[in-house]
Amino acid sequence: MFKQASRLLSRSVAAASSKSVTTRAFSTELPSTLDSTFVEAWKKVAPNMDPPQTPSAFMKPRPSTPSSIPTKLTVNFVLPYTSELTGKEVDMVIIPASTGQMGVLPGHVPTIAELKPGIMSVHEGTDVKKYFLSSGFAFLHANSVADIIAVEAVPLDHIDPSQVQKGLAEFQQKLASATTDLEKAEAQIGVEVHSAINAALSG
Amino acid sequence: MASNAAVPFWRAAGMTYITYSNICANLVRNCLKEPFKAESINREKVHFSLSKWSDGKPQKPVLRSDTPQV
């Protein structure tokens, strides 16, 4: 059955390419993602039209996973207004995932992690750089590339501890006096973020 | 196929992730030391004009801006 399909397809390829110079890349030239029974049925109904392609036919192939675990992790750390780290090779990063602090080493299992407000530390040899992230996501790929995106990331010494204490007290008070669900949620977010900054400054 | 993951409290209260993320970012910006705080607030200023269209014609534009109009 599969032999039939390729014969039918190659026949139409020859026919199509003789008609026009600018033929689209045929599905057989790209990683074949089409079901052969579908293609055969299509050919019976519409022999002059190319079978429709699926989105995966247009996607670039995934970066290959190296057979041996690389020694370094490549980190891309971006914010909406700047690219903090681009392709930096490091030994380890510790990210504040919503399930807790997660250590990422080269060869980490591919993961998408939602980040909570907390500290991210980048370890390169004995050099450790810490940032406080407001929230974001971390995409860990099979080829030991980590893409970390956050909305705000500040080095710890840019934070004013007195402002944090004031904010914490203010939101705790708002939480106690909140009425609607939305107000409660906003106050809760305030308490969580300020407690996280407090913990970060003292930890 | 129901998901068993608990819904985060902000989503249960009707907030989207983007709203949550922006609120967190604003709170962090408010806790910065002086020169960095002013820079970040300056960076986040927006200025845009919005006009709804009806009958193929733009209606009166609405201006939303963080920069004081001179």
Curated annotation (Swiss-Prot), chain A:
GO terms for cellular component: mitochondrial inner membrane; mitochondrion; plastid; proton-transporting ATP synthase complex. Pfam families: ATP-synt_DE_N. Keywords: ATP synthesis, CF(1), Hydrogen ion transport, Ion transport, Membrane, Mitochondrion, Mitochondrion inner membrane, Transit peptide, Transport. Its main location: mitochondrion. Residues 1-26 form a transit peptide. One of its GO terms (molecular function) is proton-transporting ATP synthase activity, rotational mechanism. It is found in: Mitochondrion; Mitochondrion inner membrane. SUPFAM superfamilies: Epsilon subunit of F1F0-ATP synthase N-terminal domain. Belongs to the ATPase epsilon chain family. NCBIfam families: ATP_synt_epsi. Mitochondrial membrane ATP synthase (F(1)F(0) ATP synthase or Complex V) produces ATP from ADP in the presence of a proton gradient across the membrane which is generated by electron transport complexes of the respiratory chain. F-type ATPases consist of two structural domains, F(1) - containing the extramembraneous catalytic core, and F(0) - containing the membrane proton channel, linked together by a central stalk and a peripheral stalk. During catalysis, ATP turnover in the catalytic domain of F(1) is coupled via a rotary mechanism of the central stalk subunits to proton translocation. F-type ATPases have 2 components, CF(1) - the catalytic core - and CF(0) - the membrane proton channel. CF(1) has five subunits: alpha(3), beta(3), gamma(1), delta(1), epsilon(1). CF(0) has three main subunits: a, b and c. This is ATP synthase subunit delta', mitochondrial. It comes from Arabidopsis thaliana.
